[in-house]
Regions:
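Noncatalytic, beta-rich nucleic-acid-contacting surfaces in large DNA/RNA-processing enzymes
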Residues: 1-445
């Protein structure tokens, strides 16, 4: 699949998700991230204790993604390849409005309903009912009470179907032997969701379209055509001072992962000097870990302020100045301190992120016992466990961060060394957005 893409002028991303931590994937050319160089853990991708199926997600340039899917259909047969159905459900606000409309509520009442349901992800009608204003609306009259009861019964039911944005199933036998199928816009479509398809052993691969890969490819083609220069993105230097000057100045409009005002502000304060700085920024600038950005920047500029809970944590946290950023660091700490295998450490990481109290208590004792067997005192063992528990909820997969930071660096390199081609392609991709077009033109000047 990757070989076809690379030999048919379809740009492929350097890697995505935990699969970039696989040395086999790197050696086969599936990814272009060296897991030994970047200290990535294979066990984050696959380990003996993992009970769920691993998968390799692949980024293709968005303008040629369909070409790869067509290749798969031709190679394996149209009855062996399908997309995956997804179901939209009647969530609180949608079901409340739909039922109200059917019961003859006027537009004013429907708008009132929308305003009375709090804007909270995943909120239920029962939760909304706890709010005094909503409860008063429900009991305003008998019709409203009937509306509420009907809405609660319908809440959560499937509302409509659509197609999974990236998932493709490939099977060695015709899929109609395994799953109910229907016809989608571009071929077969399972009538089972991704979870149900995986449960019976069907292989799912995510074929994702990434606009930034299309931009990179177009720049490379145009530079070759106009200047007769072959840009080998696998051979560019990762210590280019001009690139880091660009990043330090916050001139990252149009750069993958780095173009928002917030990230640009962080880059200016951080003054990145190494590729690792880019990896850290792309991992930290998310809800949750953002609160650690000031600490990270302060310690980056003041190494004497870096502190570790225990000296044994220094080799693991040195590159991030004592701040836990990556999921792999949590696994390394569990291995170093408690003697966990990397498979056991991944189970611990998953338990922490899901916050299952029963499993967490079991894993806590497992960790403390292992740490004590390794010569750590009970108090420091508990402190280290609490430390990784704090960060586990939003630790970022380092393999993914390195992969996407590579795309960001490549775009920064092209912007510095081939600015005319960079701006021309970016402007072509923001047609229709006056704000983005104006920002790009201002920066280009």
């Amino acid at each position: 699949l990757i070989h076809f893409a690379k030999t048919h002028e379809v740009m492929v991303g350097p890697g995505r998700g935990s699969s970039a931590g696989s040395l086999v994937s790197y050696l086969l050319g599936i990814t272009t991230i060296d897991p030994l160089k970047y200290n990535l853990l294979f066990e984050r991708f696959l380990n003996p204790e993992r009970v769920t199926m691993p998968d390799i997600d692949i980024d293709f340039e968005d303008t040629r993604r369909e070409k790869v899917i067509k290749y798969v259909q031709d190679k394996y047969g149209e009855h062996h390849v399908s997309g995956i159905v997804t179901f939209g459900h009647l969530l609180a606000r949608a079901v409340a409005r739909d039922v109200g409309r059917i019961m003859g509520f006027d537009e004013t009442s429907l708008n009132e309903i929308s305003k009375l349901i709090p804007h909270k992800l995943g909120i239920t009608l029962e939760e909304a009912y706890q709010k005094p204003e909503f409860k008063a609306f429900v009991h305003r009259n008998h019709r409203n009470e009937r509306w509420f009861e009907v809405s609660k019964k319908l809440e959560g039911l499937p509302r409509h179907t659509s197609t999974h944005a990236a998932g493709i199933i490939i099977n060695d036998q015709p899929l109609f032997k395994f799953a109910p199928l229907t016809t989608g816009d571009t071929g077969l479509l399972t009538q089972w969701t991704m979870t149900e398809a995986e449960r019976i052993g069907l292989l799912k691969i995510d074929f994702l379209g990434l606009r930034n890969l299309s931009i990179i490819h177009q720049i490379i083609l145009q530079v070759k055509k106009d200047l007769n220069i072959n840009i080998d993105i696998e051979a560019i230097p990762y210590d280019d001072k001009k690139v880091f000057d660009l990043l330090s100045n916050g001139d990252t409009t149009g750069i993958f992962q780095l173009e928002s005002d917030g990230v640009r502000s962080v880059l200016k304060r951080l003054q990145p000097e190494h590729f690792e700085d880019i990896v850290a920024v792309t991992s930290l600038y998310r809800p949750g870990p953002m609160e650690e950005i000031p600490t990270y920047i302060t310690r980056r500029h003041n190494p004497n302020q870096v502190a570790y809970l225990h000296p044994d944590l220094e080799p693991i946290l040195k590159n991030t100045y004592g701040v836990i950023i990556y999921q792999e660091q949590i696994m390394l700490i569990a291995s170093q301190v408690a003697g966990f295998s990397y498979g056991e450490a991944d189970i611990l990481r998953r338990a922490m992120s899901k916050k299952n109290r029963a499993i967490l208590e079991s894993e806590r004792q497992h960790f403390i016992d292992g740490a004590k067997n390794n010569g750590y005192g009970e108090q420091i063992s508990k402190q280290i466990f609490d430390l990784i528990l704090k960060f586990a909820d939003y630790g970022f997969p380092r393999a993914h961060a390195v992969s996407y930071s590579k795309i960001a660096y490549i775009m920064s390199y092209l912007k510095v060394h081939y600015p005319h081609y960079f701006y021309a392609n970016i402007l072509s991709n923001v047609i229709g957005s006056e704000k983005k077009t104006a920002a790009m033109i201002d920066e280009a000047k």
